[in-house]
């Protein structure tokens, strides 16, 4: 089933309709309120005052998504050391996120955007008629809630290091 999903996703990825417009760098990040893998509610305002890496991904338990999540997991202490938080978002439900998080021991919040409202607000919702997913894109949000970086072309193998490097560069530039 996962192989079929991956094949369909790859085959039809260029045909997906894009729902909303992506907010530009320098604009306030669209707000959100969703449940995490443990059923706890999270709001963008909860992260005010903190650097935030928000990564959208298509589907729990699929190869690229698992690679990306595990890379964030393996580098979570580096994010924490510089005062940044990581939040993953997909259209999967809370139960799916719980299984995914437990299986791979993910130590960060994964939010369930079941209706695709947040993915739409960030311009990453893709509608393939049979399924809707969030495309693999990420955003860096500064402590004031402003988008400072948008990653449109994400490689699950290297993305975490790219985000960490960009965060460190931005933070050190602010301290000068």
How would you name each of these model-derived features?
Residues 106-108, 125-128, 132-139:
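Structural micro-motif
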Residues 5-31:
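N-proximal helix/coil linker or "cap" segments that precede and/or mark the start of modular domains
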Residues 133-176:
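Thiol-/selenol-based redox modules, centered on thioredoxin-like
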Residues 29-30, 51, 135-137:
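Short loop/turn microsegments at loop-to-beta-strand junctions
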Residues 32-51:
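A short beta-strand-turn-helix
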Residues 23, 36-37, 141-142:
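Short, acidic, Ser/Thr-enriched surface-loop or helix-capping motifs
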Residues 45-66:
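Short active-site neighborhood of thiol/selenol oxidoreductases, capturing the structured segment around
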Residues 66-106, 117-118:
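Structural microenvironment flanking redox-active thiols in thiol-disulfide oxidoreductases
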């Amino acid at each position: 089933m996962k192989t079929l999903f991956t094949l369909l996703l790859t085959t039809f990825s260029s045909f997906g309709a894009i729902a909303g417009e992506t907010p530009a760098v320098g604009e306030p990040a669209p707000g959100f309120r969703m449940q995490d893998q443990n059923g706890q509610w999270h709001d963008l305002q909860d992260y005010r005052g903190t650097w935030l890496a928000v990564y959208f991904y298509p589907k729990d338990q699929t190869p690229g998504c698992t690679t990306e999540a595990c890379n964030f997991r393996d580098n979570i202490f580096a994010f924490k050391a510089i005062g940044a938080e990581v939040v993953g978002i997909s259209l999967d439900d809370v139960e799916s996120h719980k299984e995914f998080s437990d299986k791979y021991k993910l130590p960060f919040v994964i939010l369930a955007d079941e209706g695709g409202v947040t993915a739409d607000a960030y311009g990453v919702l893709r509608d393939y008629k049979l399924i809707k997913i969030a495309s693999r894109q990420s955003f860096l949000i500064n402590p004031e809630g402003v988008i400072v970086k948008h990653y449109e072309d994400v490689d699950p193998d290297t993305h975490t290091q790219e985000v960490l490097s960009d965060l460190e560069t931005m933070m050190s530039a602010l301290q000068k």
